[in-house]
Amino acid sequence: MHNSLDNLKRVQNKVNEIVNEKQLKTYPKIIVVTKTFPFSKISSLLNSGHTHFGENKIQEAEDKWGEVKSKNKNIQLHMIGKLQTNKAKKAVALFDFIHSLDNQKLALKICQYEKELNKKIKLFIQINLADESQKSGIKLNELNDFYQYCLKELSLNIIGLMCLPPINSNSQEYFSKIKKAADRLNLRDLSMGMSSDYEAAMLSGSTYLRLGTIILGERNIT
């Protein structure tokens, strides 16, 4: 018997504790990152009333959530992985949030399919703060122009910024930079913080925590 629900409650209690101790203004939502996990591992969370879940691959998300989501309109599904333009239509159809908007071509496709499907997606611009070649994301010095393009030319619903700090880095430093960038654009939401650094992310004002391992356990990736 897995203890995903107990783990979620434990994390929720820890989040409450941090919010109260640090007198934070923001209480972040917990996105349970379910990529690679079977639905049997997730069902107890869904039955408990948890609604925010994250996936990083379109096909897996369709197979796992397509039918379930059609029956439960409260589910809020988050695309947290790299999104290719040829998968944009499926992403717009299935997801409620996309955390990985990182180029003009993708922005155009999302705009196109929003109109076709008569649906507005909540979008985060992904930032590549450390200019890591293996990671996607807009450079910080390109952010303002890209944001204005998405807003004024495409009327996209940009709600915030997302980042993935470099492994073994001072996450707090990167989170603080993202917070300042969001403040400059008057963006309220921040998608930052995973199982290993969510406490630091909270101190910088994260509004969405992307948590997988700490709730569902280690992934079996072959």
Feature annotation, model-predicted:
Residues 1-189, 194-196, 202-204, 219:
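Conserved alpha/beta-domain cores
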Residues 202-222:
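Short, basic/aromatic-enriched C-terminal tail that caps enzymatic domains
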